Amino acid sequence: MDFKKDRINMVDGQTAKKTVFATGIGNAMEWFDFGVYAYTTAYIGANFFSPVQNPEIQQIFTFAALAIAFLLRPIGGIVFGIIGDKYGRKVVLTTTIILMALSTLTIGVLPNYDMIGLWAPALLLLARILQGFSTGGEYAGAMTYIAEISPDKKRNSLGSGLEIGTLSGYIAASIMIALLSFFLSDAQMEAWGWRIPFILGLFLGLFGLYLRRKLEESPIYENDVETPARDNIGFFTIIRYYFKDILVCFVAVVFFNVTNYTVTAYLPTYLGQIVKIDETTTSVLITCVMAVMIPLALFFGKLADKIGEKKVFLIGTGGLTLLSIVAFSLLNTKSLPFIILGVFILGFFLSTYEATMPGSLPTMFFTHIRYRTLAVTFNISVSLFGGTTPLVNSWLVESTGNIYAPAYYLTAISIIGFIVIAVLHVSTAGKSLKGSYPNVDNKKDLEFYESNPKKALWWIKVKKNKNA
């Protein structure tokens, strides 16, 4: 392969940061919706599953609606992944945010069971399915886009900005529910108050659409657009040649999302039902821990750019292997300072994943197959192990009677993650994306790669004997 110096991408760092903000808005909206849903499960259950008298069973049905929607994410990943690889990243990102906004609004205006009977839970499920389908393309597309527009040496620190959107969206949801719960009675919340955040989510989506329409296509995608291998590559061919990378990506997404959904979706329920903390205190506690996670994620993102994301992965998986049971033990002391410490331990190690996943997962695949492979792998993993986490944890506690069952589940997942990452993952921090010339933001790096073609195109040796 002839080395062409003019294909090294000079990226403006400030422009990249603005782009991360525009892209992260979609993630903020996704998690605003998810956060509101998690905090209002009791009200949603009472409105859409009212024939079921047991509140705990209502909650399981409500979580089941969420879990079923997650099963649609791989289909969304396939559809939007193929479109994103063939027609560009921008077209997908503008489409998914529209669909997410519409599905969020729909939940807020749906009639309840007393009004339309079985149509109520059926339409709720359809709205969640649309949400799952659109988010199947959203997050993978956002990760891919940010990785492709970021300077290689800042990919993890800028990629962590996507997860800042996650945390900000969830914090906004938590604050809104806390304010509504403070000003409205429980009866008012159940009757109509829970709908307000879902309706307001439409405006967040419109703001995100406004910003995303101004985005430019990623330079790496445009430079690769004439690659003959772009078309007619089947998923079985991709699996055949990139099985190890797909396996590492799959496992990484498992331990990331089991931890993520345990903290963000299941912990509020656990603190309320098991630990017996009131809803307002739970909301404030989770919100404060997530606020602390924002600077932690930024710190670990910068650290990953310096020492490699593999070491940061191992900090997270190793820490949760050792301390998950400790954290849940602290939660069950019933002492608020120890409860805060327990939640903080989980949030601290989750922030290592928040910092590194967006910047590292896209590096596992070559440009012409990156979006679709990442989208399908990510969403199958999320569907099986992420969205089902609240349901699995609720079922484990209900069926075993053991309040530490969620800690055992998290520990087991972390052990598997630690082993797979330690043995199979190769750090790509600071290196160009596979199949692409480097992204640089200064003259020094540009001159270095111009005089060191093998460093610039390090991935050529990886692609030897691979035809996909």
From Swiss-Prot:
Compartment(s) where it occurs, according to its Swiss-Prot or TrEMBL record: Cell membrane
Cited Pfam families? MFS_1, Sugar_tr
* Cross-referenced PANTHER family: ALPHA-KETOGLUTARATE PERMEASE (PTHR43528:SF1)
Transport: is it a keyword of this entry?
Answer: yes
Q: Name one GO cellular component term.
A: plasma membrane
Q: Species lineage, top-down?
A: Bacteria, Bacillati, Bacillota, Bacilli, Bacillales
Name-wise, this protein is Putative proline/betaine transporter
Q: How does it sit in the membrane?
A: Multi-pass membrane protein
The record ties this protein, via InterPro entries, to: H+-coupled_symporters, MFS, MFS_dom, MFS_sugar_transport-like, MFS_trans_sf, Sugar_transporter_CS
Key words, A-Z: Cell membrane, Membrane, Symport, Transmembrane, Transmembrane helix, Transport
- State the family named in the UniProt similarity comment for this chain: Belongs to the major facilitator superfamily. Metabolite:H+ Symporter (MHS) family (TC 2.A.1.6) family.
PROSITE patterns given in the database record: MFS, SUGAR_TRANSPORT_2
What sections of the protein cross the membrane?
20-42, 63-83, 91-111, 115-135, 164-184, 191-211, 246-266, 284-304, 312-332, 336-356, 376-396, 403-423
What GO molecular function annotation could you give as one example from this UniProt entry? symporter activity
**Could you tell me what this protein does?**
May be a proton symporter involved in the uptake of osmolytes such as proline and glycine betaine.
